Amino acid sequence: MAIAKEFLLTVLNYIANGVVNVQSSTTQAVTTLAPYQIIAIMKNNNVTVSRTTITSISVSDVVNASQEETLTIRYSGTDASPFTYTTDEIEIWASTQSALLYKIADIQLQTPLSKTEHDYLNIEYEIIITAGASYTTTSSMSQYTSVVTFRTLVAPILYFFALFLVPAWSTVLKQNPTFPQSQLSNYISPSSYQGINAMYVGSNQVTIVSKLVGFGTTTVSIVVNGEVTSTQVNAPIFIGVTTPSGVLVLAYNYYSGTISKYVSLTVTTTYGSATVINQFETKTTGGTT
C-alpha cells in the first residue's frame, strides 16, 4: 500500500512555492489544489472497473511525550454500484467536483476481489503522518528572532499535508479546537499562501537563493539554499513563513560550526510500500566546522 509520489510532490511544491497565480491581460485566477472530495478507483489489470466517493473521513491529532506530532487520517467508503467486476488494485485520489487532481495512494491487493451486482465493496485506508521534534515549534526559538509561539506544541508543516488529504481542512480545525493544528488557523491562509520566504541561522537572516523540490527512487525533498555569514556556534538553522506575529517556523536543525557563505536545509519524506509517511528528516550543510 503505497503513498503516491504525486501527492508528496504536490504538497512539497505548495509548501515551498505557495499557490499558483495565473494572470493575463483580461483574467486573473488562483489555482487551488486542495480537494473537494476523495475518490476510490477500482482497477483490474490497470483498467478502471468502478469508482466510488469516500463518504467518511476521520482525523486525530496528538503530540506525544517526545514532542512528535502525529496526524491519523482514515478514509472509509462503500461501492454499492450494480456492477460485477474483479479488482486487483485500488487507487485513492483527491478530486474536485468534476475532475481528478492527484493520486494519494495506490493499494495493490494480494488477492483480487470479485464483486457481483448484489455485493458491497467496503474500503478503508489509513494514513499516519508523524513530524519529529525538529518540526514542533518551541519557545526557545524566540531568543534568536521574532517567531510565532503557541500555547501547546504543534508542527506547522503537518498543516499542509492535511490540507491536501482532508477536504475543508480549515473547517475541520474550527470544529476541533483541541487539535494542536487548530492553533494555525490564524496564521495560514491556503488561498493566499506564498511559500517559504524566511530562513535564519540563529539571529542572522539568510538570503534565500533557491527553493528546489525533487524526488529520487524512494523520497521527495525540499531543499532551501541560502547565503549568509554567521559566527554563531550551535545555532539553529530554520525555515518558515513570515506573518504579522513573527516567523512561522516549519523546520529547523542545529549546526555545530560557523557558516562562511552558504547554508542549505533539506526536508525529506518517503513514498513507497508503507501506509505511514516516514518521519521527516532534516539535513544541514555549509560553512566550516
Curated annotation (Swiss-Prot):
**Keywords for this entry?**
Host membrane, Membrane, Transmembrane, Transmembrane helix
Cellular component, GO annotation: host cell membrane; membrane
Would the keyword Transmembrane be found if you checked this record's keyword annotation? yes
- Enumerate the transmembrane spans: 153-173, 235-255
Instruction: State the annotated membrane topology for this chain.
Output: Multi-pass membrane protein
Subcellular location(s): the record lists:
Host membrane
Topological domains, Extracellular? 1-152, 256-289
Cytoplasmic side, ranges? 174-234
The answer to keyword Transmembrane applying to this record is yes
Question: Where would you say this protein principally sits, based on its record?
Answer: host cell
Q: What is this protein called?
A: Putative transmembrane protein ORF289
